[in-house]
C-alpha cells in the first residue's frame, strides 16, 4: 500500500495486470497539482473583450474564441424538423408578405415602394424624401463604426482584400507579430476599398489560353492588323481597378492570419450587401466639395491622403494596383438608380413626389428597399425579337395598310379555261404576315380551340351538297372534275351519276353492287387499299368514303369516270375550314392548302390543316387550348414588336425591379391568358396575337401600387387622374382595327386582382396587416371565379354578341370596319 501511495494514488490500478507487475520497483512518477492563479492574472491572460457588440461578429474575419464567448455562443441543441404542412404554410405566408417574422423583408418592400413612387407618381412627402436621401439606419456602416464621416466614399465590396498589410499598415517594415483580427460591425473597412496586401514580390499573371490567342489572331487578320499587336494588346491595355483572383498577391502572414481570412460562412456571405452597382458614379468632380483637410480614415486611425485614394493608389509605399476603369464602365457600374416604391418611370414622367409627413416605421420600410434584376424582361424581349424575325423571314410581309388588298389574275379553273379571279386580303399596318399565316403559327383563334357551331353548320352544308355531286367528264377526254350538275356544261361535257337502281349492276352479287353516286377517279370496284369487301363494304354515301391509296393496275377499266384524267382535287381556302374541289393553280392563287391524294372534301379536315401546329387528337374536334398563352409570344409585325419592346423596357422592367421576376412573370402570363380567353369568347373569328392583355395587366399594377402608396404621396389624386388618362388614351387606340380591346379590358381586371395579391405591400399598422390578408384572399377568389366563368363560357355556354364588336373596332366611317374579317358572317 505504501508503494502504491508513493507512486501516486491517481494512477489507474488494474488487479492482475501484466503491465503493473512489470513496473520497476524504484520508478516513481510525481504529478504536481495545478497551481491556482490569482484572479487578476487569470483575467489578464484572456483576450480583451470589446465593449462594442459589433466587434463580436465579423463578416470578413473570424476572431479567436475566448472563454467569455463560449458561454454566449453555445451550439444549439437538436430540434425536431418542421413538418411539410408547417413549411408550406410558412413559405406561403412569406410569399404573400403576411407572416409574423417578415418584418425585415417588409422593410425592403417598403423602400422599393418609395423609390418607385418618387419616379412614377410625383413628389413624395418631405419626410419620406429626406429619409430616402439618408443612409440606412438598420445596417452599421463603415463611417458609423470606425470613424466619423470625413467624406463621401464609394462602397466597393471586395471580400478578397483582407491582408495583413492593410489591417496593420504600420508593420510593413517591421517583423511580423501575431495580432487578433479586428473587423468592425457587419461590414469591414476592406469592403469599401480595393487595396491588396503583400509587398514582397510581384503578382502572378495568368497565362493566356491557346483558344483565346487563336481568336485574337483571327480577329487581327480580319481587321488587317498585325498578329503580334493583337497578342500583345492584352499586356498593354490592362486597365482595371480590381485584379482577377489569379493576379492577387500572396500575403506574407502567419498561420493565424491565414486561418481568419480563409472562407466565409453562409450567414456571413448572405449579410454582405451588393454595393458595387449601388454607389454613385466616380468622377473627377466626386470629391470637389470635400475640404482638403478631410480624408478617409483607416481602421487604426491613419488618415489616407485624398489624392492617393481618389487616384486609386495603394496605401503602403511601393504598391501598385493598375489604372482606373474607363468612365463608361464606371458609370454603368456605379450609377444604377434604385426603383422607389410608388415612384417609377411613369411617376417620373408625371412628376410625382412623396408627402411631407410619414411615420418612422414606414420610413424604415422604404429605406431598406432594394431593386431586383429584370431577368424576365430581358428574356421576354429577346424571345419576342427572335420569334418576330423568324416569322418575317419565313412567311414574308403582307400588304401594308388599313384597307383590303385586292389581287386579280387569270387562273385555270374547273371548266378548263382561264378565268379572271380576285383574291381579297386584309392589309396589315403592323408590317407583318397575313392573318392566315398568323393562325398557322399559333394566333388566338376560337375555331382552333374548341368546336364552333357555325363552322360545323358550314361543313355540314358542304357535305350535303357533295352528296348530290357527280363526275363531269369532258367530251374530248381532256379531263374530268367532281362538281354539281348545274356547273357541268351539257354540250362540252358529260355528267356521270347513277341514281338508286339505275346503271349496270348485278343484283345477285352484293360485292359488285353499283353505288348511288360517282366520284371522279375513285370507285370501290377498282380500289385495292382499302378494299371494299366483306364487313368493310363502302356505303352508298360518298361523304363516308375513305381515301383510296392504291388503285388496280389497269390502263382501261371501261369506267368513264376512272379512265379520265382528274383536274381538280380538294383545296382548303380561307380561315373557316371552307373546302372546294378546284385546280392546283387556283388553290395556290387563293393561298389555300391543296390535297393531292384526296378526291372529296369530306375526306379532308380543313380546319386541322388551317390551324397547323400539333394535329388534333380527333380530327373533328379542335383542341389547341395552348393557343391562349402561345399567342403572347407572337406579334403581328415589326412595328407591333417594337411597341412591345418599348413597353417592356420601360414599364415591365421598372415593375420587375420592384417586385422581382417571379411575381411579375406570374402577373404577366396570367393576365395575358385571361385577356386572350375573353377575346376568344367575344371575338371568336378574329386572329389576334401579342401580349395585349399582359400589358394592360401591368398597367393595372401601377394603379394597385398607387393605391397602396396613397398615404405616402403628396398629391395622390393628381397621380390617379394622370394614370387614368393614359389608360383611356390606350383604350381609344384599341378602337382601331387590329387592336383587341376585349383582351385589354379583361387583362386589366385580372392584372389588378393579381397585383393586390402578389405585389409588395407597405403596412401602416396591425390593422393594415389583417386588411392585407383579407385583400389577398378576396383577390385570389375573385380571379379564380373570373377565370372559371370564362372557361365555362368558352366550352359549355358559348355566347355570340355582335354588338361587342364596337368595343374593338368602332365604325367611324361607313367603310372603316367593313369586312374587317373576311367571311365574318358564315352562310
Swiss-Prot record:
Taxonomic superkingdom: Eukaryota
Topological region Lumenal: 403-627, 685-686, 740-744, 795-827
GO cellular component: endoplasmic reticulum; endoplasmic reticulum membrane; plasma membrane
Record field: transmembrane: 382-402, 628-648, 664-684, 687-707, 719-739, 745-765, 774-794
Stated role: Regulates ADAM17 protease, a sheddase of the epidermal growth factor (EGF) receptor ligands and TNF, thereby plays a role in sleep, cell survival, proliferation, migration and inflammation. Does not exhibit any protease activity on its own.
Record text on subunit structure and interactions: Interacts with EGF. Interacts (via cytoplasmic N-terminus) with FRMD8/iTAP; this interaction leads to mutual protein stabilization. Interacts with ADAM17/TACE.
Protein name: Inactive rhomboid protein 2
Species name: Mus musculus
